[in-house]
Amino acid sequence: MGNIHIQTKSKEYDVHVGKEVLSNLTTIVQNMQPAVSNVMIISDEAVASLHLQTVIDALQVEQHVFSFVVPSGEKEKSFENFYAAHTSALENKLDRNSLILALGGGMIGDLAGFVAASFMRGIRFVQVPTTLLAHDSAVGGKVAINHPLGKNMIGAFHQPEAVVYHTPFLQSLPEKEWRSGYAEVIKHALIGDVELYHWLKEEVQTLADLHDEKLIHILTKAIPVKANVVSQDETEKGVRAHLNFGHTLGHALEKELGYGNITHGDGVAVGMLFAIFLSEQVYKVDLAYEDMKQWFLKYGYPKMPGDLNVERIVQLMKQDKKANAGAIHMVLMQEYGVVNVVSISDETVHIALEAFQKDMV
């Protein structure tokens, strides 16, 4: 078990990581000032069926505790569910001293966090992640819902009071979700902890290695990379954009293929490979792209689909939040551990994407 301290301009809080940290929830809630009036747990059907009662039992508090459960899947991070959650909150008499508890993966963390950010102009919430992917999204305060024209386009910055990362919850994950979350671990290693990157290559030969002490080690190394960036740039005006390494193409693939048809991590993995492919050309450096490609494929990450229309993907990349004045801005790598946001012309991206697509066949 280990605590990771997060410090931003707006709030300080701890990430509790370990096999027995769920019991910390009671103390966290009881110690909040002003006192918590009641607790709303937001979850999805898959997670609720496995873990909702466990969390309710762990919450040994006097306050009224109720739940709001949505269907599972990224497409459920919608305005309709956001609105329905507000309705449930009002019907159950949530007030400004209430607490929302986000029980689930990144989708639930984003949805519940945005409900908390907007209900009565902002109430407190706690993240209880149940996926490896959420080691990224649960920390840092970015909360949002999707719009049909783009992912995470409606949202806010709203820091949690705490993050309780009870690792036994992750054991029920299917392989594709382990792979999806591991992509963000790789991202954090590549942009901010080269020592972790080398450790991963040695110690994580298959996704089956992501358990017990190795899992806790990974979380306690990857989360501080995110924490360090967020402490410098809470609202993504500068270096926080570095955390979007691999996401410009990744989000475009999610949008083109349809949310739920490719996991976020699979999209980011393809996006990171493309970013390395393009970085070698832009910076005239050797980043061992071929070795990286084989390493990714070993874990089962997909290739860039050969039947996608490249020009369509370029246009979707221009809808990315980093885009400025209609120009694509990507996070590129000068060397392992050193990344920058770079403006890239449509033509350069198009040519590189075509070459990348052919290389991945």
Swiss-Prot record:
Q: Which SUPFAM superfamilies does this one have?
A: Dehydroquinate synthase-like
Q: Which family does it belong to?
A: Belongs to the sugar phosphate cyclases superfamily. Dehydroquinate synthase family.
- Quick one: which pathway? Metabolic intermediate biosynthesis; chorismate biosynthesis; chorismate from D-erythrose 4-phosphate and phosphoenolpyruvate: step 2/7
Catalytic reaction equation(s): 7-phospho-2-dehydro-3-deoxy-D-arabino-heptonate = 3-dehydroquinate + phosphate
| A GO molecular-function annotation | 3-dehydroquinate synthase activity
Q: Which CDD domains match?
A: DHQS (cd08195)
* Keyword list, A-Z: Amino-acid biosynthesis, Aromatic amino acid biosynthesis, Cobalt, Cytoplasm, Lyase, Metal-binding, NAD, Nucleotide-binding, Zinc
Q: Which GO terms describe its biological process?
A: amino acid biosynthetic process; aromatic amino acid family biosynthetic process; chorismate biosynthetic process
Keyword NAD belongs to the record: yes
**What does this protein's record comment on cofactor binding?**
Binds 1 divalent metal cation per subunit. Can use either Co(2+) or Zn(2+).
Q: Where in the cell is it found?
A: Cytoplasm
Residues where Zn(2+) binds: E184, H247, H264
> Which amino acid positions bind NAD(+), per UniProt?
S72, G73, E74, K75, E76, K77, T130, T131, K142, K151
User: Which cofactor is essential here?
Assistant: NAD(+); Co(2+); Zn(2+)
Keyword Zinc recorded: yes
EC number(s) recorded for this UniProt protein: 4.2.3.4
What do the Gene Ontology cellular component annotations say?
Answer: cytoplasm
Q: Which domain of life is it from?
A: Bacteria
- Tell me the InterPro entries matching this sequence: Dehydroquinate_synthase, DHQ_synth_AroB, DHQ_synth_fam, DHQS/DOIS_N, DHQS_C
Q: Which HAMAP family match?
A: DHQ_synthase
Please report the name of this protein according to its UniProt entry. 3-dehydroquinate synthase
One Pfam family hit: DHQ_synthase
Role noted for this protein: Catalyzes the conversion of 3-deoxy-D-arabino-heptulosonate 7-phosphate (DAHP) to dehydroquinate (DHQ).
PANTHER family xrefs: 3-DEHYDROQUINATE SYNTHASE, 3-DEHYDROQUINATE SYNTHASE, CHLOROPLASTIC
